Amino acid sequence: MSDSKHVTYEDAGVDTAEGGRAVDAIKQMVKDTNRPEVIGGIGGFGGLFSAAALKDMEDPILISGTDGVGTKLVLAQIMDRHETVGQDLVAMCVNDILASGAEPLFFLDYVAIGHIEAEHMAKIIKGVADGCKLAGCALVGGEMAEHPGVMAPADYDLAGFTVGVVDRPKMLDPANVRPGDVILGLPSTGVHSNGYSLVRKVIGVDGIMPGTPEAAAKAEELSRPLEELGGASLADALLAPTRIYVKPILELLRNGANVHAIAHITGGGITENLNRALADDVDAVVTRNGAEMGWDVPPVITYVSRQAELAPNEACKTFNMGVGLCLIVAPEDEAAVTEALVALGEKPFRVGECVEGSGKVVYSDER
């Protein structure tokens, strides 16, 4: 090592000055997500959030969640469209804790990137901030990690973390689900943030590096309108941000709606998520007739499923099939909950019903 020359951090590929500019570019976005409980601003060693209001609860339970966006980011990078993947990140975390009836309080993000550019970073964090505002939670901190020599300059990955609270007497519990209960669904915007490893195979983007002529040609191809998608492009349909269901569902619960359980339909589709909201002695029977579900499926999910030649069972354990969130309610409460959801601007539909069983999801065309 004696013949080694002087090397700076910048020589190694880490641009701390550009990192500082990136922080300056996002400060106002972060501030705009603040709740009254937030103490101070970004730049400290930890995000501060007052818990004083929790004393008004009988037994406050803190619920945490963490997730990422997965390989949907590959498509965003090829298309050079980064403004909404942050909303995907927030949605994946806050919708998960919403399944327990929790209100998201605050959020933190982690961005690993090959090379930090302030303008690029601002686009990503704007999506995170927009998602936090949709969820009503504060963005109290985060990390931008530059990984030169490990990741390509334009390559990045995202992770998110949220903490929420629910009063124990109001916490949703799958143990409350009974045979005869009705399963209601709320529509997704499309694929949301799961199933993109399959999507990438179908649309032929595997192995394409962002910023290359090959990526530009593929981006042009994916931007063309398709008749099968009602004139939308594959890029638009596949990059539609994941819905955040927090505000309407919390309002529904605060208004006294009797909801037994909620399932966020993510990786594993209906088959491997709805079962997580069931009691051990209950099965969910989901309405299906062959490749047709009992509700409208977004055209992009139908398109990808057909291109991949997925059997109905494979599609249902890969994609959300147009259902972003499921609510399980007693049959006598179905009409009231449906009416309340409509009043909140939602478009609920019946997904199926619960029967005696062993905690599985089954389909009506297989019974």
Go through each PLM region and give its residues.
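Hydrophobic alpha-helical scaffolding
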Residues: A12, T16, D80, T189-H192, ...
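Glycine-/charge-enriched secondary-structure boundary and capping motifs
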Residues: S2-D11, H120, I124-A138, M151-L158, ...
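N-terminal amphipathic/basic leader segments beginning at the initiator methionine
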Residues: S2-E37
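Short, acidic (Asp/Glu-rich) active-site segment that either coordinates a divalent metal cofactor
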Residues: T66, D157, K170-G230, L234, ...
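Hydrophobic face of alpha-helices
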Residues: V23, A122-I125, Y196
